[in-house]
Amino acid sequence: MIRYCIVLFLLITINLSSQTTIITGNAQGKPDKLVRVIVYDDLFSGLEKTIASSLTDPFGDFAFKLNIDNSQFAFLALELDKGEFYLTPGSSYRFEISSDSNLNRGSVFDRLPLMFEVFADDGGLQTSIEKFNIEYNDFIYNNVNRIYRTKDNSVVNSFIDYINENYSNDDLAYFDNYVNYTLASLKWLSRIKNNREVLQEYFINKPVLYFNIQYCDFFKEFFKSYFNSEKVFRYEDLIPVLNYSKSIT
């Protein structure tokens, strides 16, 4: 029965509404360099696509105008180096890449992220995610033994209560889902929630959040483990279903 419910929830549709997003920036001391905006074409398989590209002018300036449908995780790339940010429809962004952010010279596998300062007029999504990530990563770093190696869940429950109290934002649906599925992963990994409870609370009869990176990361992590343990079918078999459902919405 659970197997059929899993397939059914994957076919829930989403509504799209395209809006113009403006990106400007400057890469100090880097004229005539390729700048790109990259997003995931498919978060479930990790396929990327470039949605805008341009060369910096003699002063290092660049500008893009994009029509996007959904808030989503993105990369700003300068040549082969790239750094992370979050795109929101109808928003504007200003990037400052300092002159000491030298392009990496080594192997593409050893490259550091592109460092930049971003000024986002996006309703607060970028700063909200940055602030939440700092608190969440600090919590994991300082409590890793208690979270994963003991049965004492009090520290996790207290942290979840704190996050729910301080990071609820009904005006930012992407951020609310980002937080919700980050905490879902924490509950599952700390064994506060078992497989069946996670399925019922976070996936069955819930919309598929194709563009939310935390949802998709947890989806992949959970179902790979779930299918391996339950021997239902392989996670890889779900990707065509997910992509078909996305294509008809």
Question: What are these model-derived regions, one by one?
Answer:
Residues 181-249:
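Charged, long alpha-helical assembly modules
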Residues 1-25:
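Bacterial Sec-dependent N-terminal signal peptides
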Residues 169-174, 209, 213:
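Short solvent-exposed coil/turn linkers within tandem alpha-helical repeat scaffolds
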Residues 19-171, 188-205:
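A non-transmembrane, solvent-exposed segment enriched in polar/low-complexity residues
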